[in-house]
From Swiss-Prot:
The keyword Acetylation does not apply. This is Exodeoxyribonuclease 7 large subunit. Its EC number is 3.1.11.6. GO terms for molecular function: exodeoxyribonuclease VII activity; nucleic acid binding. It catalyses: Exonucleolytic cleavage in either 5'- to 3'- or 3'- to 5'-direction to yield nucleoside 5'-phosphates. NCBIfam families: xseA. Its main location: cytoplasm. It comes from Shewanella sp. (strain MR-4).
């Protein structure tokens, strides 16, 4: 065997080129499969295997991608994934890197069922206090179902066996497939418009989750909730549960159980009827005896009554009421008179003439007070002026002159208090108590 010299691959190179070929050729793919070997380590990444009956492929979904998945995958679950084919080069493993994941088949329907269930529960459609009691004496049952299905046969058979007197009115509708929920809503609305039955039985036989899906409709849930007639939901087998079961006033596990719930056994019904009749007879007899005793008592009282005495009592009663009425009228008139006097007095006090007199007196009083206050103010001001004049006179230079002193100033009117301020020949002015003297300095003597 001849070995080529230039075209020998390393393992890393081979795995790298395989990865490039796979990623470049296939790109993004959608894949449907069953989960196995699922693991979620502390890193937050998911590792799993997707398989069908013949093959399997390893998959990885990293933390940044799996955080958008609205459910927790489990082994055995069918899922629909979108991802890119790649190769994990360190081991040479071919794998799918998942970007998005959805439940597939019944898994998706189950997820939608739980989401709608939570939404309607939050809106109060399942609340126990909104459930209506079923009528006690049901005469007519409205059955909403397919007229050709097994459910209607079971219902009619049970009713015929237990209570043939019950009348059945069928509101035919589609109970499977597209737009079946709208047909059921229409049948319920027709029954509510006619109001010809006592209760509605919504029913169909068993089937897959997909077969029963029309009973998981939000529109149907609101129609059942708003129905004026009580609704019993009897859909599928005992293990089947639909949204209509939660919203209905009563849930029955099967169509036959729904019919039994709404009917009474003939033997038991006859026995109960006999019991009711017996009680009615006893009640009638007791009532008759009671009325007879009451009639006898009234006859005895009537014999004891004297019409003349009764008339006198009424006359006396009339006189008493007349006196009380006269006293009440007198008191009322007296009260009205006092009220009138009070109002007249208040009116006089509120009259403009009275108010004018009051304001005139008040103005005169205020004028007197103002004049007195002004006189007091003038007297006080005069005293303050006299006191200030006396104080000024005490410190005034003129007061000093009156005691024989004089004030000498130079030509610039500056007071001379030192001979050194003058020179021979300066003109000076001497102010006496009476008059002034103009002088010329001829000699200066320093006495310091």
């Amino acid at each position: 065997m001849q070995v080529p010299k230039n075209n020998i691959y390393t393992v890393s190179r081979l795995n790298g080129e395989v990865r490039q070929i796979l990623e470049g050729q296939l790109g993004k793919v959608w894949l449907n499969g069953e989960i196995s070997n699922f693991s979620a380590p502390s890193s937050g990444h998911w590792y799993l295997t997707l398989k069908d009956h013949y093959s399997q492929i390893r998959c990885a979904m990293f933390k940044g991608r799996n955080q958008s998945v609205s459910f927790k995958p489990v082994n055995g679950q069918q899922v629909l994934v979108k991802g890119a084919i790649s190769v994990y080069e360190p081991r040479g493993d071919y794998q799918l890197l998942i970007e998005s994941m959805l439940p597939a088949g019944d898994g998706l329907l189950a997820q939608q069922f739980e989401a709608l269930k939570m939404k309607l529960a939050a809106q109060g459609l399942f609340a126990a206090d909104t459930k209506r009691q079923l009528p006690k004496n049901i005469q007519r049952i409205g059955v909403i179902t397919s007229p050709s299905g097994a459910a209607i046969r079971d219902v009619l058979h049970v009713l015929a066996r237990r209570d043939p007197s019950i009348e059945v009115i069928i509101y035919p509708t589609q109970v499977q497939g597209e737009s079946a929920d709208l047909n059921i809503c229409q049948a319920i609305n027709i029954a509510n418009q006619r109001l010809e039955v006592d209760v509605l039985l919504l029913t169909r036989g068993g089937g897959s989750l997909e077969d029963l899906w029309c009973f998981n409709s939000e529109a149907l849930a609101h129609t059942i909730y708003n129905s004026a007639l009580p609704v019993v939901s009897a859909v599928g087998h005992e293990v089947d549960t639909t949204i209509s079961d939660y919203v209905a006033d009563v849930r029955a596990p099967t169509p036959s159980a729904g019919a039994e719930l709404l009917s009474q056994d003939s033997d038991n019904k006859s026995q109960r009827l006999a019991t009711v009749l017996s009680r009615l007879k006893q009640s009638a007899s007791h009532y008759q005896l009671k009325q007879e005793r009451r009639l006898s008592l009234l006859e005895h009282r009537l014999q004891r009554l004297d019409p003349k005495r009764t008339l006198q009592q009424f006359e006396q009663r009339f006189d008493e009421m007349q006196l009380r009425l006269e006293a009440a009228l007198s008191n009322k008139l007296h009260g009205l008179s006092r009220r009138q006097q009070q109002l007249a007095s208040r009116l006089e006090q509120q009259s403009p003439k009275h108010k004018l007199a009051l304001e005139t007196n008040r103005l005169s009083y205020l004028a007197t007070r103002l004049q007195d206050a002004m006189q007091d103010t003038l007297n006080q001001s005069e005293q303050r002026v006299k006191y200030a004049a006396h104080q000024l006179e005490t410190v005034s230079p003129l007061a000093t002159l009156s005691r024989g002193y004089s004030i000498t100033t130079d030509a610039n009117h500056q007071v001379i208090d030192n001979a050194a301020q003058l020179s021979v020949g300066d003109k000076i002015n001497t102010r006496l108590r009476h008059g002034q003297v103009q002088s010329t300095v001829t000699q200066i003597t320093d006495e310091s």
